[in-house]
């Protein structure tokens, strides 16, 4: 038998899975990166990143959330890379922002402003 149920809510979340299929960008030299490159789609917990330097590519809400979670769980340093504009967030010590990724040379990542930094892992959001 079917029973109709009516309920009222203050808020409703519609999670349709629009971003279910990960977008995996390709940068020059990414194949030389010795660490792990993983999409947030496959991320399960921050523990594997404890003590590591992590680059989070994508600085919108999911990227910011992931970056803060990694920081709180003990990542050595977390950088969020943005494409359009910086988020202008007062990040805690051990976190920062960088412009768009331009390429990799081993563990060293080059950003759009010419700056470079070394990372142990890259998470794509």
Please place each PLM-identified region on the residue numbering.
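Core beta-strand elements of the Rossmann-like FAD/NAD(P) dinucleotide-binding domain
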Residues: 2-11, 50, 112-121
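Core Rossmann-like FAD-binding/catalytic domain of the broad FAD-dependent monooxygenase superfamily
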Residues: 1-3, 16-17
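Glycine-rich dinucleotide-binding loop and its adjacent helix/turn
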Residues: 14-73, 78-80, 90-97
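A Rossmann-like FAD-binding core segment of flavoenzymes
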Residues: 68-125
